[in-house]
């Protein structure tokens, strides 16, 4: 199973912790690099306007058919119509279908113009970057897109996006399809709501700009992250809108939040805690802030709860602006093994 990287991976365009996404491709055991002796690869993209009408029709028809299967909860037929690596590890997509079935039932769909991606070469491409559409002197235009996908075997692929409306909420469903003879098989399944905690990308953008104008850059940065995440249907897609938001966010990025593997140290109750991640998370109708920190052992729940509480209070003391942006804070103590212990504290209870 492979996870598609964002076009601006250092910024984490999509918070992978919120919601679940599945994209499966046949992967090599080792990462492939390019060296003077490595055969060249070609990677090309055709927009809907560039491809043959028969190809576009086939892609749109396949996407509609797979949506209908998803709305019925027909995971068996979806699995039969998947590429072999996906079918052999189908639990993630099956869970996603079940999770989204209620939102799909009775909904109406509109298929966006699809993209056709081609990888030529003798072996899988470790990092395929597809530039789709017309680019200007400053980069992307309103009709362009960039996709970055890892470990793609030579083949033809499509990214086909559906707007799903009329169900529980407005959302997108993105299929990655791979050509197999005359068929287009399922290679990836991504469902994503257009809102977080009841708000869309525009709302988060406006709030981020308000925070930035008030020099609340920590809040601005985190809200920009949500705006960017909501502005593209999938992590591995970049558009003019996401690029512009990214540039705005960079101007507000604080230097004292943990990013790109760095840590932030806070002191609480005579102990130093190493914070590794801080990010927003929707919990029901609330937007909370999650903070992860390093812990040696989380087997003692009572002690871990006390340490979580200490970290939460220390974080909000250090950054009091969080009080106006988030309903609560979730602290997660994480062992080196990855096992963790989490607890939530409402902002009104943080004294």
What are these model-derived regions, one by one?
Residues 1-19:
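N-terminal secretory signal peptides that target proteins for export/translocation
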Residues 91, 98-168, 198, 257-297:
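Surface-exposed, charged secondary-structure patches
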Residues 43, 152, 156-199, 280-303, ...:
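Short beta-strand edge/turn micro-motifs at domain boundaries
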Residues 66-78, 208, 214-218:
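Short helix-adjacent coil turns
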Residues 193-273:
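Acidic, serine/threonine- and glycine-rich low-complexity intrinsically disordered segments
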Residues 22-35:
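Bacterial N-terminal signal peptides
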Residues 46-54, 60-61, 76-143, 228-258:
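Short solvent-exposed beta->alpha transition segments
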Residues 40-72, 188-203:
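Short, low-complexity N-terminal intrinsically disordered segments enriched in polar/charged residues
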């Amino acid at each position: 199973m492979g996870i598609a990287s964002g076009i601006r991976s250092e910024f984490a365009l999509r918070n992978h912790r919120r919601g679940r996404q599945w994209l499966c491709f046949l992967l090599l055991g080792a990462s492939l690099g390019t060296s003077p002796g490595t055969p060249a690869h070609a990677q090309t993209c055709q927009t809907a306007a560039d491809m043959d009408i028969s190809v576009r029709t086939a892609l749109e028809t396949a996407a509609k058919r797979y949506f209908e299967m998803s709305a019925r909860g027909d995971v068996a037929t979806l699995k039969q119509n998947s590429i072999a690596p996906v079918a052999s590890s189908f639990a993630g997509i099956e869970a996603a279908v079940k999770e989204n079935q209620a939102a799909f039932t009775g909904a109406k769909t509109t298929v966006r113009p699809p993209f056709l991606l081609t990888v030529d070469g003798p072996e899988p491409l470790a990092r395929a970057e597809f530039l789709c559409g017309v680019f200007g002197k400053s980069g992307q235009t309103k009709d362009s897109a960039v996709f970055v996908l890892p470990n793609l075997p030579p083949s033809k692929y499509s990214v086909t996006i559906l707007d799903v409306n009329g169900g529980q909420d407005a959302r997108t469903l993105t299929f990655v399809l791979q050509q197999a003879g005359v068929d287009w098989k399922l290679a990836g399944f991504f469902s994503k709501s257009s809102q977080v905690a009841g708000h869309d990308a525009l709302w988060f953008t406006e709030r981020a700009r308000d925070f930035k104008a008030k020099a609340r850059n920590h809040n601005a940065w985190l809200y920009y992250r949500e705006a960017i995440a909501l502005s593209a249907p999938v992590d591995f897609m970049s558009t003019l809108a996401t690029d512009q938001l990214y540039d705005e966010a960079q101007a507000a990025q604080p230097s004292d939040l943990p990013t790109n593997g760095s840590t932030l140290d806070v002191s609480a109750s005579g102990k130093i805690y190493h914070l590794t991640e801080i990010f927003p998370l929707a919990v029901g109708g609330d937007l909370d802030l999650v903070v992860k920190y390093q812990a040696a052992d989380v087997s003692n729940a009572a002690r871990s709860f006390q340490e979580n509480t200490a970290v939460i209070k220390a974080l909000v003391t250090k950054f009091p602006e969080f009080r106006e942006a988030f309903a609560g804070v979730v602290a997660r103590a994480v062992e080196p093994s990855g096992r963790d212990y989490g607890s939530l504290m409402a902002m009104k209870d943080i004294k």
